[in-house]
UniProtKB/Swiss-Prot annotation:
It is found in: Cytoplasm. The lineage of its organism: Bacteria, Pseudomonadati, Pseudomonadota, Alphaproteobacteria, Hyphomicrobiales. This is Protein-glutamate methylesterase/protein-glutamine glutaminase. It is an enzyme of class 3 (hydrolase). Disulfide bonds: none annotated. The active site is at residues 160, 187, 280.
């Protein structure tokens, strides 16, 4: 891949340059020292992937991500110091379409990256490379009702790039007494899930927490996949995690969860596929539709990255293709109709 580096610190730039070249599979397309410069360079030389810092002069990484995804969309990996202390910015950038985030590798005495932190970054780059091969970027292809103790309706949501903001928009539409059980599979490292849960909790009156082994979906509660393994139903209404299929590049996989819900959930399912790169979730959404469940895909105009919803639309997996602003109300309408 051709990779752009956006960072204002010379030592960090050199470290990232070495790591990009160390695999022998990638090249540094260009280096920008602030967000505005990156936006301008992308207009004339769009790389396959951008390694984007967050805190920079002139224009920060959040605003640069927003502008790049609006003007010349491409894959963006946030690489910055201390993600834990910048979670709000991380999720805002992901809401604009950044794929993932990782701490910049620590530097040893000799100025080299520590092996563990360097391996984490190169693994993420390799994973994104597989996603890009699976689905090119857009630029390259230029209700309110009483809660039930045992829910009959499962709201299964899948999302990837741009997902946090899209999920927040959907959840914010639900009333405090919403009766459906909600399970979210968002492509995100497990270490960031607690921060995502806290951030989403600011946008919904519903309780929200990471999904644990043997959890049961509860009416009016949001459970979020929180492992590098796949979230599945291991029995009727009981969740768990499994490493299989091990060769699935998407971890946790939306397809795996949707297919599991189609097999095990005893009531009705509303499958929702939001913005994201690649095709994950399309096949599972189709399986839900084939079993008579309501399925919804986000439309092109409101998707930060129109990959996963497009894949669903292409195979006829979605009963409804809706703008983000209409998805929450459509779910509420369907739930009220079934009461």
């Amino acid at each position: 891949m051709r990779i752009g580096v956006v960072n204002d610190m010379p030592m960090a730039v050199e470290l990232l340059r070495r790591l990009v070249l160390s695999t022998g599979e990638h090249q540094v397309a260009w280096i920008a020292t602030n967000g505005r410069e990156a936006v301008e360079v992308c207009r004339r030389d769009l790389p396959d992937l951008i390694l984007m810092d967050l805190a920079m002069p002139v224009m920060d990484g959040v605003e640069a991500t927003r502008r790049i995804m609006a003007e010349t969309p491409c894959s963006i990996l946030l690489v910055t110091a201390s993600i834990e202390s910048n979670l709000a910015d991380v999720y805002e950038a992901m809401g604009h379409g950044a794929l993932d985030a990782v701490d910049i590798p620590s530097v040893g005495i000799e100025g080299n990256a520590s092996s563990q932190s360097a391996r984490l970054l190169t693994n993420k780059i390799a994973t994104i490379g597989k996603l890009i091969g699976d689905a090119p970027t857009k630029a390259k292809r230029r209700m309110s009702r009483a809660a039930e103790p045992t829910p009959r309706r499962l709201i299964a949501i899948g999302a990837s790039a741009g997902g946090p903001a899209a999920v927040a928009a959907v959840l914010s539409a639900f009333p405090v007494d919403f009766g459906g059980a909600i399970v979210l599979v968002q492509h995100l490292d497990a270490q960031f899930v607690p921060g995502l849960v806290d951030w989403l909790g600011q946008h919904t009156p519903l309780p929200i927490r990471p999904a644990r082994e043997r959890d049961s979906p509860q009416a009016g509660t949001v459970l979020v996949a929180s492992s590098a393994d796949h979230l599945v139903f291991k029995s009727v209404q009981q969740l768990g995690y499994t490493p299989s299929p091990k060769d699935n590049v998407y971890r946790p996989s939306v397809d795996v969860f949707f297919e599991s819900a189609a097999q095990w959930w005893p009531g009705s399912v509303i499958g929702v596929l939001l913005t994201g790169m690649g095709r994950d979730g399309a096949r599972g959404l189709r399986q839900l539709r084939d079993k008579g469940h309501l399925t919804i895909a986000q439309d092109r105009a409101t998707s930060a990255v129109y990959g996963m919803p497009k894949a669903a639309a292409d195979i006829g997996a979605a009963v409804d293709i809706l703008p983000l602003s209409a998805i929450g109300s459509r779910i509420i309408e369907a739930c009220e109709r079934s009461t």
